[in-house]
């Protein structure tokens, strides 16, 4: 049996192992298309600001082709470094494209104010054609800018500090688009607006240079459809991270935005580890989780072997990303989601609409959190040197904190996944009722009758007398012995009023016919 287990572990390890690169075969190259990237040909701030202005207008032109749009975006993304040409040549290794760099300098003879640097050749007409400069004699009204502030006609400046602020503002809006351009483009607007507000408050961007939504939609769509552009952006992020010492302010801002970009599309894998394994609840000992725990262990090893590109596997369209989907460990993922919605309010808006979602293990995670509230891990306590007395104190404080958090019910709570309606009385589900459930309902019914006959104060005494001692107390209805007697009496009276009102509404709703609504218990039949 020990040999079988060793063979199984070796099999799982080799199954999820990435392919080993061999030096015998050559690299597979695809059919390349040419991308022209304009870069400044001198160190003048005027040249850079004028090039930035022309590229922003070029991107907003709806008639621009895809490769030309990619080249313009790469040109803007590399404008913040001293030598954009060297940066692009150093980090670009794409089998699908061939990048051609065109140096741009100032010109008084062209309509765009720029021309391509050449030796004795007049390139003003070609530069005007590339930048699609509007003819002043044309009857169509030219579009001067793509900013929400219509008073901004151009962004040409002479001051390096002002240029860096304008460039940083535009780059921040472009980089934020990468976070959800591939995984959730339809719901990206809200998160992008939050990032914009954050950087505006931090004075990293200038609010007046907020780009129009149409312009941002064009860039987001291009990022989503062009893998070569995403490869360049990821390579630029990694190159910035490898840079030692202090980095330029724009580079630090890009690293800050990278925290929202990494692990995009890997939420199921990361959250399963966070809520399913790191919480270390005893439910992990179930036999049903044994195989999936082994799968997760292999995936974590594979993630480490992939190196620095692992967090970007979805953005880079790496085929190995399918191994990390929740369909490879559905039971453990469903359990982890149940734990997550109980521990964090931010998990309440997560979409669980998956074919492999298991409601039973989702409720297992919920109940594991509820019943383990206030308990201290003995293993962790021994490692931290926590005494038994300290553990009891922590448990008592944690119980009060948990009750207070649940009673306030702050934020969205998707833990309430089942809803019982008026036509679904408790008698319709007899096989789900145990002895304890019958005793609790009997005690609640007697408490309601006592409230109607004797009033609030005597009803609370009747409720306390009829409540079974072996029945688990509900944290929403039970009071702690250490509470103030007046507070306990008021809480009991308020709860009894609500229960009495609920009983009256159930009696009134039993006479009306409503369509049958299935709850999550029916899913398990």
Swiss-Prot record:
Region (Homomultimerization): 1-36, 373-391
Record field: compositional bias (Basic and acidic residues): 428-452
GO cellular component: a single term: helical viral capsid
Region of interest called Ncore, as start-end residue ranges on this chain: 1-403
UniProt KW keywords: Capsid protein, Helical capsid protein, Host cytoplasm, Host nucleus, Host-virus interaction, Phosphoprotein, Ribonucleoprotein, RNA-binding, Viral nucleoprotein, Virion
Residues modified as Phosphothreonine: 279
Region annotation RNA packaging and organization of the helical nucleocapsid: where it falls in the sequence: 1-375
GO molecular function: RNA binding; structural molecule activity
Residues annotated for RNA binding in this entry: 180, 195, 202, 260, 351
Region named Ntail: 404-525
Motif position, Nuclear export signal: 425-440
Keyword Ribonucleoprotein: yes
Free-text description of this protein's post-translational modifications in UniProt: Phosphorylation at Thr-279 is required for the formation of the nucleocapsid.
Disordered: annotated segments: 418-525
Family: Belongs to the paramyxoviruses nucleocapsid family.
UniProt function note: Forms the helical nucleocapsid (NC) in a ratio of 1 N per 6 ribonucleotides, protecting the genome from nucleases. The nucleocapsid (NC) has a helical structure with either 12.35 or 11.64 N per turn, approximately 20 nm in diameter, with a hollow central cavity approximately 5 nm in diameter. The encapsidated genomic RNA serves as template for transcription and replication; encapsidation by N is coupled to RNA synthesis. Forms the encapsidation complex with the phosphoprotein protein P. Before encapsidation, the newly synthesized free N protein, so-called N0, is chaperoned by P.
Quaternary structure annotation from Swiss-Prot or TrEMBL: Homomultimer; forms the nucleocapsid. Binds to viral genomic RNA. N0 interacts (via Ncore) with the phosphoprotein (via N-terminus); this interaction allows P to chaperon N0 to avoid N polymerization and non-specific RNA binding before encapsidation. Interacts (via the Ntail) as N-RNA template with the phosphoprotein (via C-terminus XD); this interaction maintains the P/L complex anchored to the nucleocapsid template during the sequential transcription.
Protein name per UniProt: Nucleoprotein
């Amino acid at each position: 049996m020990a040999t079988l287990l060793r063979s199984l572990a070796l099999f799982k390890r080799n199954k999820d192992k990435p392919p080993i690169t061999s030096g015998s075969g050559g690299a597979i190259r695809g059919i390349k298309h040419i991308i022209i990237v304009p870069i400044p040909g001198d160190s003048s701030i005027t040249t850079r600001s004028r090039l930035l202005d022309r590229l922003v207008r070029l991107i907003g032109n709806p008639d621009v082709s895809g490769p030309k749009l990619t080249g313009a975006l790469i040109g803007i993304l590399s404008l913040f470094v001293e030598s954009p040409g060297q940066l692009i040549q150093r980090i670009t290794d794409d089998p699908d494209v061939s990048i051609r760099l065109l140096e741009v300098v100032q010109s008084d003879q062209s309509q765009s104010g720029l021309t391509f640097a050449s030796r004795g050749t007049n390139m003003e007409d070609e530069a005007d054609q590339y930048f699609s400069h509007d003819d002043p004699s044309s009857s169509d009204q030219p579009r001067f800018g793509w900013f929400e502030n219509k008073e901004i006609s151009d962004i040409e400046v002479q001051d390096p500090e002002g240029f860096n602020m304008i460039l940083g503002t535009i780059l921040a809006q472009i980089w934020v688009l990468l976070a959800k351009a591939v995984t959730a483009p339809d719901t990206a607007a809200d998160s992008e607006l939050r990032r914009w507000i954050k950087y505006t408050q931090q004075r990293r961007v200038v609010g007046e240079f907020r780009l129009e939504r149409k312009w941002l939609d064009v860039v987001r769509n291009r990022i989503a459809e062009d893998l070569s552009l995403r490869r360049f952006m990821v390579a630029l992020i990694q190159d910035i991270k490898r840079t030692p010492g202090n980095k330029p302010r724009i580079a630090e801002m890009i690293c800050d935005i990278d925290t929202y970009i990494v692990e995009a599309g890997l939420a199921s894998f990361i959250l399963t580890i966070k809520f399913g394994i790191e919480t270390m609840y005893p439910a992990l000992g179930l036999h049903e989780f044994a195989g999936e725990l082994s799968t997760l262990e292999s995936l974590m090893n594979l993630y480490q072997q992939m190196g620095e590109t692992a967090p970007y596997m979805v953005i880079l369209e790496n085929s190995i990303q399918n191994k990390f989907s929740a369909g490879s460990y559905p039971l453990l993922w469903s359990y982890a989601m149940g734990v997550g919605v109980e521990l964090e309010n931010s998990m309440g808006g997560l979409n669980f609409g998956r074919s492999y979602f298991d409601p039973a293990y989702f409720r297992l995670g919920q109940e594991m959190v509820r019943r383990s509230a206030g308990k201290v891990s003995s293993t962790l306590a021994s490692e931290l040197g926590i005494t038994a007395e300290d553990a009891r104190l922590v448990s008592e404080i944690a119980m009060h904190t948990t009750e207070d958090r649940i009673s306030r019910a702050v934020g969205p709570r998707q833990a309430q996944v089942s809803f019982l309606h008026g036509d679904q009385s408790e008698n319709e589900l007899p096989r789900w009722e145990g002895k304890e459930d019958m005793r609790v309902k009997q005690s609640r019914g007697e408490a309601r009758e006592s409230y109607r006959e004797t009033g609030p104060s005597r009803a609370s005494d009747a409720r306390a007398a009829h409540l079974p001692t072996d029945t688990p107390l509900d944290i929403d209805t039970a009071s702690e012995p250490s509470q103030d007697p007046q507070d306990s009496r008021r809480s009991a009276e308020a709860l009894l009023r609500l229960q009495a009102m609920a009983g009256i509404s159930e009696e009134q709703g039993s006479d009306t016919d409503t369509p049958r609504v299935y709850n999550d218990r029916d899913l398990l039949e």
